Amino acid sequence: MRAPFQVLVFPYKTVDNKSRFLIARRRDNGVWQAISGGGEDNESLLEAAKRELSEETQLVGCNWQLLDSMCMLPKVFYAGNHYWTEHPFVIPEHSFSVKVTEDPQLSNEHTDYRWCDYQEAIELLTYDSNRNALWEINERLYKAS
């Protein structure tokens, strides 16, 4: 059963000593966003993030990082929400970054993908939660170098 939380996953890789971030275009509404999805049953946040990344891109990453960036989303957006009595109005969206080395093989949830530098990704992303998470990842990577 769908768990009452959402995960947002930003894969990144280094090309010519610069960070590139993977964003994908959703088939259902055409927006550019990070990889995302809901937890299932008793999955941990990290288990859900790894599963979503694999299901939607066939990627396996390393250096997983749970970010400080998170937001709350209206639960009415998600099927089965009437079972989530402990969350009467909203559910949390937890964000992750993950380092990858390969290109994705997209599931049918997406029509296209791009490896973007920070500025291009910020301009293409539709949702504030995605832009906030990407800002945090970019800051973490910049400060680590």
Residue ranges and their predicted role:
Residues 93-135:
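NUDIX/MutT-family hydrolases
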Residues 4, 34, 89-93:
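Short connector loops at helix/strand junctions that flank enzyme active sites
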Residues 11-13, 25, 99-100:
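Residue-level signal for short segments within beta-strands and strand-turn junctions
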Residues 1-21, 41:
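Conserved N-terminal beta-strand and adjoining loop/helix that marks the start
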Residues 139-145:
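Generic C-terminal helix-cap and adjacent flexible tail
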Residues 18-62:
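Conserved Nudix-box catalytic region and its N-terminal flanking loop in Nudix hydrolases
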Residues 70-104:
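Active-site-adjacent beta-strand/loop module that shapes the phosphate/pyrophosphate-binding cleft
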Residues 60-72:
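A short coil-to-beta-strand element that immediately follows conserved catalytic motifs
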